[in-house]
Curated annotation (Swiss-Prot):
This is Pre-mRNA-splicing factor CEF1. Residues 1-55, 56-109 form the HTH myb-type domain. It comes from Candida albicans (strain SC5314 / ATCC MYA-2876). Its main location: cytoplasm. Associated with the spliceosome. Residues 142-161, 308-329 are annotated as: Disordered.
């Protein structure tokens, strides 16, 4: 006898709806076969129809408006019985469109819900969208519900049947499983190793109680000397201990390792963190690759634009005469080509002239920047003896290679030492030169004598000259000429003579300006330091107090803003209540007037009837 054929379907329950929602959260809205495997009484098509027709949050379950009713009637005239197309246009399900259309037709025909003519209504395009007859629509005994997917779920019983309990337990187990195959295998291996270790310890304990001592390690020396790749690290190089104490770090590492082992043994390895880290690394790698591609593309485009500009500047237009032209036209075309060539030559000359100007400006700029470089402080090399410029005198005694070396070398000259003494002492001592714009205007300064004024003007002129020569050549100023050495020596001699004739008693010695060095001065300095320290502490305390004041001010401001908001809310509510009271009072007055007028009319009618 063949087994009974079980047809899937039937009324949906709350348990099945919840399982369907949880499965869609995990698997999505495309894996209907996998979702239907959690519901043994439903097929994949029924599961999809239940989601699309009833459970989807995208469904429009609001009341129908007049505009939608008019649109539904017009669309049914255009697309008769094409409920799928009509539902897509109205953003509703086909069952909703069918039921609404049937309701509108019944209302227009005057048919009530309890009439027999209701059974002649329309049906949808398929079994999933037929007007369903659920538990709430008054199914007769023995009738079959053809489309329960679009109707509310049946309430659960107080005691669930065994098959629904099994279905719920299996769904919980499958949907709550977040570990992969590898994590499960690792957990099984870990549990197996733990059980083996516990069994070995139990066996050793029993043997020890019987008087037999058994070690966990083997006694075979050959096997004991073999390397255990599971327990140790092959070719491990332990780093040497450094100057710092790492005992606390090692304790922390051991604690974290033990904590991680306990977490893995209880909960297992979470693959989510590893997957997230791998995804972040892949996204970062992709971003770097895209960034490199963009940089290469930009460089390639820049190089291509430069090459194209260079080629365009070289390229000339090819002007050929049309075929079959006369001699006169040929001469015209020849003249035009000659003029074009001349114009091209002129344009090339202009381009070359502009390039030469740019090169000259760049060369001047480079020269100015090189002139700003300070002279070398540490020169190494041997000082060659002075040799006359006439090489013919000693050519016989020197080889050709020596002559080339001597000609390429820079021989010392007395003029270099003489010139170095003719520049200003500030430059000789490599002291900083002030900027000319920072100097005071001499017109605003009052001088006692004319000599002081001349000295100040000469000082200004010398500063501008040195700054222009050694820092910035574009600054306004006149460079001073080199001084005559004889004149400089004469001035120095005059200064020495005048200094020798001066009275020694009037000259202050340098000893008067030496700072005192004794114990009292040290004590006074220490006292001053203590006073400065105390003042600094007072200032810091004041700063801290000011910060406390600022915090209190911020708190007060927050309280004020909060109170102001509350006051504004209360004021708004008061104004609203006041407006409502005014409107209600006006409405009451109008209603009283209306009622009084009606009472007067009734009184008049009563009087007339009497």
């Amino acid at each position: 006898m063949a087994p009974p054929l079980y047809v899937k379907g039937g009324v949906w329950t709350n348990v099945e709806d919840e399982i369907l929602k949880a499965a869609i959260q995990k698997y999505g809205i495309y894996q209907w076969e996998r979702i239907s495997s959690l519901l043994p009484k439903k097929s994949a098509k029924q599961v999809k129809a239940r989601w699309v027709e009833y459970l989807s949050p995208l469904l429009n379950k609001t009341d129908w408006t007049k505009e939608e009713d008019e649109k539904l009637l017009n669309l049914h005239k255009i697309f008769p019985n094409q409920w799928r197309s009509i539902s897509n246009i109205l953003n509703r399900t086909a069952v909703q469109c069918v039921e609404r259309y049937q309701k509108l037709i019944d209302e227009a025909a005057g048919i009530k819900p309890g009439d027999d003519e209701e059974n002649l209504g329309l049906s949808g395009p398929g079994i999933e969208t037929l007007p369903a007859v659920g538990a709430s629509s008054g199914l007769a005994v023995g009738e079959m519900n053809l489309n329960p997917e679009s109707k509310p779920a049946r309430p659960d019983d107080e005691d669930l049947p065994d098959d629904e309990r099994e279905m719920l337990a299996e769904a919980k187990a499958r949907l709550g499983n977040i570990q992969g195959k590898k994590a499960k295998r690792k957990a099984r291996e870990r549990m197996l190793e733990e059980s083996k270790r516990i069994a070995l310890l139990q066996k050793r304990r029993e043997l020890k109680s019987a008087g037999i001592n058994v070690k966990l390690t083997t006694r075979n020396k050959k096997k004991r000397k073999e390397f255990d790749y599971n327990a140790d690290i092959p070719h491990e190089i332990i780093p040497q201990a450094g100057p710092y104490d790492t005992a606390e770090e090692l304790k922390q590492n051991d604690f974290e390792k033990q904590q991680f082992g306990q977490q893995v043994s209880t909960k297992g390895i979470s693959m989510k963190d590893i997957d997230d880290r791998i995804a972040k690394e892949e996204s970062r790698r992709k971003k770097e690759i895209e960034k490199k591609k963009l940089e290469r593309k930009r460089e390639f485009n820049a190089a291509a634009s430069l090459i194209s500009e260079h080629e365009d500047s070289k390229r000339r237009k090819l002007n050929l005469p049309e075929p079959g032209t006369h001699n006169f036209e040929k001469t015209k075309s020849d003249v035009l080509t000659l003029t074009n060539q001349a114009n091209n030559k002129l344009s090339e000359k202009e381009i070359a002239r502009n390039q030469n100007k740019k090169r000259a400006a760049v060369a001047q700029l480079i020269k100015a920047t090189f002139e700003r470089l300070p002279p070398p402080k540490h020169e190494t090399g041997e000082i060659l003896p002075f040799v006359s410029t006439n090489i013919l005198e000693f050519r016989n005694d020197v080889n050709a290679n020596d002559i080339s070396d001597i000609a390429g070398a820079k021989l010392p000259d007395e003029t270099a030492t003489n010139v170095s003494t003719l520049i200003s002492r500030v430059v000789q001592r490599e002291l900083p030169i002030p900027h000319p714009n920072n100097l005071r205007d001499l017109s605003t300064v009052k001088f006692d004598t004319l000599v002081d004024k001349l000295i100040a003007e000469e000082c200004h002129r010398l500063i501008r000259s040195d700054y222009k020569q050694y820092h910035d050549t574009t600054i306004n100023g006149v460079s001073t000429d080199k001084y005559d050495r004889d004149l400089l020596e004469k001035i120095n001699q005059d200064i020495d003579k005048e200094f020798a004739q001066m009275d020694v008693s009037t000259v202050h010695s340098f000893e008067d300006y030496v700072l005192p060095k004794n114990f009292k001065v040290a004590e006074s300095i220490i006292e001053n330091l203590h006073t400065f320290h105390n003042e600094n502490e007072k200032l810091t305390n004041k700063i801290l107090e000011s910060t406390n004041y600022e915090d209190q001010r911020d708190q007060k401001l927050q309280q004020l803003t909060h109170l102001w908001r509350e006051l504004s809310d209360v004021n708004l509510s008061y104004s609203i209540e006041k407006k409502l009271f005014e409107l209600e009072s006006s409405a009451i007055d109008k209603e009283l007037l209306r009622l009084r007028s009606e009472i007067d009319k009734l009184n008049k009618k009563i009087e007339t009837l009497r």
